[in-house]
Amino acid sequence: MIITIGGLPGTGTTTTSKLLSEKYGLKHVCAGFIFRDMAKEMNMTLQEFSSYAETNTEVDNEIDRRQVEAAQSGDLILEGRLAGWILKKSDIKPDLSIWLKADPMVRCVRISERENENVDLALEKMISREASEKKRYKEIYNIEIDDLSIYDLVIESSKWDANGVFNIIEKAIDNLKA
């Protein structure tokens, strides 16, 4: 089984992916972790690396390559803002493609708690990062990140806690047609 989970920062994609991975015994591959690791390898902050990635397409190409390679082996949760799009462009059909969304201020508070920084700083970084990514996705892939038409399930994650979101997805998985 291949499941993609996408969403903007602070929507709960990592938490949800981990819960699903544990429940279904699927490997968890996260594009964000790959991106963060690459930023650390280059001694850059996420903001600096996002700016760097805008003009260096090899960053996205490497992340994509690793995601497609993982998906080809099957049985995984592929987490990333473009996970669903990358598989679509590679002619790999996931069993379920999910997008999590949440109110920007809810996301900002979640990010500030996760990163242990004040909300104003988290908001500034979030806006900058999302603008950078949106630009990059359009230029490199001709993808509008706001186009949710490829997803089987779109969940407003600010309405439920992590277990509530997990329960919705669990029901969807358990009711997939064979």
UniProtKB/Swiss-Prot annotation:
Broad class of where this protein is predominantly found: cytoplasm
Residue sites binding ATP per the record: G7, L8, P9, G10, T11, G12, T13, T14, T15
Recorded superkingdom: Archaea
This enzyme's EC code(s): 2.7.4.25
Keywords noted in UniProt: ATP-binding, Cytoplasm, Kinase, Nucleotide-binding, Transferase
Class of the enzyme per the UniProt entry, highest EC level: transferase
Annotated GO MF terms: ATP binding; CMP kinase activity; dCMP kinase activity
Family matches, as Gene3D superfamilies: P-loop containing nucleotide triphosphate hydrolases
Location in or out of the cell: Cytoplasm
Transmembrane residue ranges: none
Catalytic activity line of the entry: CMP + ATP = CDP + ADP; dCMP + ATP = dCDP + ADP
Annotated CDD domains: CMPK (cd02020)
SUPFAM superfamilies, sorted: P-loop containing nucleoside triphosphate hydrolases (SSF52540)
GO BP, one annotated term: pyrimidine nucleotide metabolic process
GO cellular component: cytoplasm
Family statement drawn from the similarity comment of this UniProt entry: Belongs to the cytidylate kinase family. Type 2 subfamily.
HAMAP family reported in the protein's UniProt record: Cytidyl_kinase_type2
Protein name: Cytidylate kinase
Organism: Methanococcus maripaludis (strain C5 / ATCC BAA-1333)
Recorded name of the encoding gene: cmk
